[in-house]
From Swiss-Prot:
UniProt-listed HAMAP family: Ribosomal_bS18
Protein's UniProt name: Small ribosomal subunit protein bS18c
Pfam families given in the database record: Ribosomal_S18
Organism of derivation: Adiantum capillus-veneris (Maidenhair fern)
Key words, A-Z: Chloroplast, Plastid, Ribonucleoprotein, Ribosomal protein, RNA-binding, rRNA-binding
Length: 75
């Protein structure tokens, strides 16, 4: 029997310590948005709950200011 499906190795964090979560940092925010324009879940992003909250509010602010699209319909 397998012990578990999860690997025991440590994954690298998806946000480096020198990166700040800001609505103006669109290159960082695009990593956390799916192809359809949805905010990815915390488990997919490997973020803490505090980081996920900050990312979500930054993405929403960037959408309102037209820095990020609400939906990504580029075909």
């Amino acid at each position: 029997m397998n012990k578990s499906r999860h690997s025991s190795r440590r994954r690298s964090p998806s946000i480096r310590s020198d990166e700040t979560i800001d609505y103006k940092n669109t290159s960082l925010l695009r990593r956390f948005v799916s192809e359809q324009g949805k905010i990815l879940s915390r488990r997919m992003n490997r973020l803490t709950s505090k980081q996920q909250r900050l990312i979500a509010t930054a993405i929403k602010r960037a959408r309102i200011l037209a820095l990020l699209p609400f939906s990504n319909n580029e075909s």
